[in-house]
């Protein structure tokens, strides 16, 4: 008589705060233990809180009432400011709380006073963790968070008398007893490329565990699965030898994304004309789109088109120095090394700017091409503007598309999106890279289930 297969344990429940479109949740839902890759999810998002309507609609389209995967109950999506949110019944039973309090206040890209006000949102995260009392909490943020007053306040909250005194912070990877405080804090920085992302994106990841959790072992940060290629390494050196177990793989290059996108037609400059009613936000919103719908272009001015054409592989704004261009009657662009090309009767214009020409250092990524053979730079919310960073296609005369940015972040082809082009770009750029979220999920699963 066949022995019946034991019932799988109940999924580990997750509450996602400042959830955005659900990148962190997607990473957790994608995790499967080794040997159970074909089984159902082991993590289940029960609730999410997000104040942005389009992002909340996207979350609902993937994990709420409009989700395609019905193997798990729908997450409750709360569209409201977190300051006024009181944990709902399902949230009060979450095993894990994850979230990244809005990071713009900590970011070097935002030095406005309003950033300081947004930094206080981390206190709301602490308030909710103290109320829910999960087994594990995870805070994700930019690297500057580790030097902020808010981080030091967090360290105080886990001490006796603090709101989180029932918790202890997990030592960061590589921590040594001899580390200085500053050295220890730097170890909280994880690079998504070390965990299989095709993007070099460093994020502060701070994990806390409740002192009453009954586990056979301590929670540890996930081991890295990929390492940066040394300057002297070759592809051949990465090939495994028979009978010899290899260590981590080399960082994944962004090439796979562009090999994929070149097989898809670049369709127009707009999203499909589609709207849907999302009950969680009680509105008709643009969508529901899939990642496949996001491969559209832009309508750049002639100057931008000329710059895209003139910048070589691996190049950036510095390659525009001493370059001029003309626009033919048919709209064609010609590039010249002189302001007075012989036989040219159309107006000749300079490609660079005085500001760019006068600065040999800094902003090296401006108007830069992504490099083949390497991971992408960090995908931010305005990746569709090469003036903002290294966001030109590696070889084509255009910026990367929303599709390519989403795939660089690790979103699956069937991920569902709501909102305008700008809304979706913001959702993509603010998300936690999916492979990084999955790696963190693996460490939590090992702690709670093995």
Residue ranges and their predicted role:
Residues 11-14, 201-205, 374-376:
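Extracellular structured ligand-interaction cores
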Residues 21, 151, 203, 430-438:
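Short alpha-helical patches at coil-to-helix transitions and adjacent helical residues
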Residues 43, 198-200, 373, 402:
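A short, structural micro-pattern
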Residues 87-94, 106-353:
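Class I S-adenosyl-L-methionine
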Residues 6-7, 41, 176-186, 355-362:
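Intrinsically disordered, low-complexity acidic Ser/Thr-rich regulatory segments
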Residues 2-4, 193-194, 363-368:
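Generic recognition of flexible, low-complexity loop/linker segments
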Residues 2-136, 143-156:
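Core alpha/beta nucleotide-donor-binding catalytic domains of modification enzymes
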């Amino acid at each position: 008589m066949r022995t019946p297969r034991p019932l799988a344990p109940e999924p580990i429940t997750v509450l996602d705060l400042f959830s955005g479109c659900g990148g962190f949740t997607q990473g957790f839902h994608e995790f499967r233990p080794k040997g159970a890759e074909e089984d159902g999810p082991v993590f289940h998002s029960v609730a999410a809180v997000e104040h942005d309507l389009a992002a909340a609609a996207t979350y609902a389209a993937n994990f709420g009432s409009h989700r395609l995967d019905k193997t798990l109950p729908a997450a409750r999506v709360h569209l409201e400011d977190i300051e006024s949110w009181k944990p709902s019944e399902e949230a009060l039973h979450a095993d894990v709380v994850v979230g990244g309090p809005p990071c713009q206040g900590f970011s070097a890209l935002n030095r406005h006073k309003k950033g300081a006000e947004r930094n206080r949102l981390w206190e709301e995260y602490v308030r909710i963790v103290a109320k829910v009392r999960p087994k594990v909490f995870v805070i994700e943020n930019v690297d500057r968070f580790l030097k902020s007053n808010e981080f030091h306040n967090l360290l105080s909250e886990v001490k006796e008398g603090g709101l989180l005194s029932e918790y202890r912070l997990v030592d960061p990877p590589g921590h040594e007893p001899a580390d200085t405080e500053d050295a220890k804090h730097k170890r909280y920085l994880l690079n998504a490329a070390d965990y299989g992302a095709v993007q070099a994106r460093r994020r502060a990841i701070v994990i806390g565990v409740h002192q009453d959790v009954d586990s056979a072992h301590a929670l540890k940060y996930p081991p890295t699965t990929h390492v940066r290629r040394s300057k002297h390494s070759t592809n051949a050196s990465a090939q495994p030898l028979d009978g010899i177990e290899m260590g981590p793989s080399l960082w994944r290059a962004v090439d796979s994304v562009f090999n994929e996108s070149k097989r898809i037609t670049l369709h127009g400059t707009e999203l499909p004309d589609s709207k849907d009613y999302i009950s969680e936000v009680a509105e008709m919103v643009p969508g529901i789109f899939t990642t496949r719908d996001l491969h559209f272009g832009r309508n750049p001015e002639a100057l931008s088109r000329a710059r895209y054409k003139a910048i070589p592989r691996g190049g950036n704004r510095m390659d525009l120095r001493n370059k001029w261009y003309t626009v033919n009657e048919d709209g064609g662009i010609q590039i010249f090394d002189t302001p007075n090309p012989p036989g040219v009767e159309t107006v000749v214009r300079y490609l660079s700017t005085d500001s760019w020409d006068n600065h040999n250092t800094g902003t090296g990524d401006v108007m830069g091409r992504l490099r083949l053979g390497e991971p992408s730079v960090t995908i931010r919310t305005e990746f569709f503007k090469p003036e903002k960073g290294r966001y030109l296609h590696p070889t084509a005369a255009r910026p990367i598309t929303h599709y390519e940015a989403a795939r660089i972040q690790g979103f699956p082809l069937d991920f569902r999106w709501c909102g305008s082009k700008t809304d979706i770009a913001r959702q993509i750029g603010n998300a936690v890279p999916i492979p990084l979220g999955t790696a963190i999920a693996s460490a939590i699963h090992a702690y709670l289930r093995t």
